[in-house]
Amino acid sequence: MIGLLKVVACQALSQISVDKNRIQVYKENPQYWQHKSEPVLLLGGSVEDNLFQIPNLKEHLDLLQSVGGNYVRCTMSCRDEGNVWQFNEVEGLYNLDQWNEEFWQRFNNFLRLTAERDIIVQIEVWATFDYYRLNWDINPFNPKNNVNYTFAQTNLPEVVDSHPTQTENNFFWSVPAENNQRIVLKYQEKFVDQILFYSLKFDHVLYCMDNETSVTPEWGKFWAEYIQAKANDAEVNVETTEMWDSHNLFHTQHQNTLGHPELYSFCDASQNNHQRGQKHWDNAQKFRAQLNPVRPINSVKIYGSDQYHFGDDQDGFERFWRNVFGGMASARFHRPPSGLGLGPLACRHLKSMRMLTDNIHIFSCQPNNHLLSNRRENQAYAITNIGKEVAVYFPKSGTIDIDLSLFDADLTLQWLNINQSEWLNQMSVHGGKVVALTTPSQGHWAVLIR
């Protein structure tokens, strides 16, 4: 019966007339997104991962927009100070049949404000870390915290002391293909239904099943199919993915995304941002080469900050630029302290990236370091539309050679001071040959030749 329902759902999905205004895979180059019928490169950074819970949301979104940002992450998370949970609480216990209207008002307001600014939202339905350790102790889904079910009825644990990679919370094994725990699943579905009640009304939302999951792939599969079916009922098309925990893109976890485009219409490669330097680039390019069909690869969490241990500021900047020059569909600085968020330094790099990509048709370009010679590891990176335009990113000062033999003889060259978000004056350069490029001074630089 379940198999028959899947077939019917797939047939119905294929009959949906896709609204061209909705965020969807770009028809001309499916490694990117389009929104409102136009291709979009998604760039972002923010102070938190669950922005709908913060008090100064409008001002934060305005700041993001002012520096060229158009992309935010939205974990459906409730664990931080000042957050509210999604269910109603009475005398110390939650009722999973009653909503906390404050939570949903915040969520709806967030969707409205981002829509008004054409800021794309990537929802993570299940905020993994809300369901482990101290956060599970206060979570409404913990049987001790609600009036709806008991430990005996659900086999859910009272205490989960381990890290999520140990997958010791049965909450994530409720789906029919695993424990088939219908009592728990009923309320999980109720929560997802309420998310979709609000989000499906908007055209700027992407859906990721989890944050850094290590659980059975049947969990993500169930929710991807569930969300797709609900969207089908609403006669809209949605884009779905999963975010795995492994920092190695070639771990079997990530194969569950690569190998199932019917479930996951895009990929999230955020965990590759634990890699550094040339390896960060090489792994991403190898991962891209394995995509069949080609799909957008998002990078919703770019780690790297002097304040934490996932790399320093320099790593964060480099990862951001390598992601975009490497053909990723999105790049967003992770929240502090693990990332640069939307702090002053992140704002400069966001502004500079938008300045550069507004002056090159990035959607017609491909990564192409083969044009570069006399290049050391991690010295420079190129993205190009051969014969028309090429951009090169330098993480640090230096000199490399670029082969312009397939470009016209008369070209212009212009340097972008990334740290200052400032273009230098254009100069002429002759194509048809190999040309040396030397950064004007220290720091991060990009050069545009066309």
Model region roles, listed by residue range:
Residues 433-435:
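Short strand-edge motifs at loop-to-beta-strand transitions and within beta-strands
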Residues 304-307, 312, 316-427, 438-450:
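Aromatic- and carboxylate-lined catalytic core of secreted/periplasmic carbohydrate-active enzymes
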Residues 182, 187-190, 201-348:
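Extracellular glycoside hydrolase catalytic/binding regions
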Residues 20-263:
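Active-site mouth of glycoside hydrolases
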Residues 7-9:
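N-terminal signal peptide c-region/cleavage motif recognized by signal peptidases
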